[in-house]
């Protein structure tokens, strides 16, 4: 099996890589995340996964299309539906395309690791793209190791632990409660 694994970030990769290696599967990571904003956050996450891959002796491929303009155009009419409309499909489709064009026979994604993502939708998209591109989809419910992976990423590997999913709107969501409290305190 020649596995290309879309990697959203280093912390989410830890458990996925460890569990696949325990099965005798050596993934190649694929970094394609044009939904991560602002740019300094994108760079921080990219550098972190680069260092993680070097530490773990993993092959990693970087597709550095930074897509703020496209992201804004695509999601402006439906900010609430951004994950379904843009964030998941654009990254997964590009991963399957790259796999097909570069001789990978199987794809998976670290998006299946997070307990905060739309797991069933991600799985459905991967199954759809698998049929469309003729590349197998390796499904694993990596969520079973969420806390184990989180602990290793943070405490053993000292990886950068981001505070929000990636896009500028998810960063706003991170502060929503604080914004509401500030409105009550200061008016507005």
Question: What is the meaning of each model-derived region?
Answer:
Residues 1-188:
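Nucleotide-activated chemistry modules centered on ATP-dependent adenylation/adenylyltransferase
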């Amino acid at each position: 099996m020649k596995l290309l694994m879309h990697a959203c970030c280093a912390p989410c990769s830890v458990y996925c890589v460890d569990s696949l290696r325990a099965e005798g599967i050596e993934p190649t990571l694929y970094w394609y995340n044009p939904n991560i904003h602002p740019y300094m956050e994108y760079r921080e996450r990219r550098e972190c996964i680069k260092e993680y891959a070097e530490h773990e002796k993993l092959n990693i491929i970087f597709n550095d299309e930074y897509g703020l303009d496209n992201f804004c155009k695509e999601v402006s009419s439906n900010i609430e539906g951004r994950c379904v409309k843009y964030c998941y499909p654009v990254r997964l489709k590009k991963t399957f395309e790259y796999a097909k064009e570069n001789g990978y026979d199987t794809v998976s994604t670290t998006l299946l690791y997070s307990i905060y993502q739309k797991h069933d939708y991600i799985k459905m998209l991967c199954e759809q793209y698998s049929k469309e591109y003729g590349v197998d989809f390796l499904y694993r419910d990596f969520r079973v190791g969420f806390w184990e992976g989180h602990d290793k990423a943070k405490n053993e590997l000292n990886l950068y632990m981001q505070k929000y999913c990636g896009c500028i709107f998810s960063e706003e969501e991170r502060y929503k409660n604080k914004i509401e409290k500030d409105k009550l305190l200061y008016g507005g």
